[in-house]
């Protein structure tokens, strides 16, 4: 549970489903990276028949309040996040014996699409698609330092500015934050991300105050984590 890994069984399961839908025979040799995780499913309530298959469990969320007053939301999925938030806030308001109208229906999220921006070149369009209304911040960063407009990792769509932006504006604090979460480099091409791990670490080091020792630690930790994924996939072959 602490470290779920994608096994060879998982890979073959996905490949079997994929090959049933496409004409090209896709094999494990075509896989450049994998991802695995856990879904926060809510267990069936008392009185309901409990299935042993996770596929049968509900994706619905549940808001509950403990006797001590702690409000908890469990389950759910990304596509229903606004409903999850609404139900949670409604429970808080009920607990506080107050009421208020929801104001988020037309509220743009940070990075929402900015259709008014006049973007034409390839880099600008990439930033718009990735960062929406925040794209102007990255564009200004690149204007001040042209090297930030260069690729972060060869063959992947991300720019060096995106790693710096992640540290300055998105609370990225580790190399893994950059390569796995703020960008999806690890999922798109794990081998390429490993090959560029040191370069990325050296790029963000000044912004995080890392010493050479910390750079080495970050790179080693990331590479070992990726190696664990490779070993998990090979373990059941």
Question: What is each of the regions a protein language model found here?
Answer:
Residues 2-237:
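C-terminal accessory subdomains/tails of enzymes that are appended
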């Amino acid at each position: 549970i602490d470290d779920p890994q994608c096994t060879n069984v998982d890979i073959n399961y996905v490949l079997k489903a994929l090959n049933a839908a496409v004409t090209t025979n896709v094999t494990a040799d075509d896989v450049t990276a994998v991802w695995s995780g856990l879904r926060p499913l809510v267990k069936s309530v008392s009185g309901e028949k409990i299935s042993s298959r996770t596929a049968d469990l509900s994706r619905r969320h549940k808001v509950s309040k403990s006797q001590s007053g702690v409000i908890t939301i469990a389950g759910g999925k990304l596509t229903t996040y606004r409903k999850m938030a609404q139900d949670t806030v409604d429970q808080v308001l009920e607990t506080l014996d107050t009421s208020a109208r929801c104001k988020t229906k037309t509220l743009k999220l940070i990075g929402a699409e900015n259709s008014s921006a006049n973007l034409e070149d390839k880099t600008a369009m990439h930033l718009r698609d990735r960062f929406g209304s925040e794209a102007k911040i990255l564009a200004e960063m690149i204007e001040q330092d042209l090297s930030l407009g260069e690729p972060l990792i060869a063959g992947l769509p991300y720019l060096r500015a995106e790693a710096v932006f992640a540290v300055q504006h998105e609370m990225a604090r580790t190399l893994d934050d950059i390569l796995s979460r703020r960008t999806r480099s690890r999922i798109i091409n794990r081998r390429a991300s490993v090959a560029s791990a040191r370069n990325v670490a050296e790029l963000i080091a000044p912004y995080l105050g890392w010493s050479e020792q910390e750079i080495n630690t970050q790179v080693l930790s990331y590479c070992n984590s990726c190696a664990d994924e490779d070993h998990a996939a090979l373990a059941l072959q």
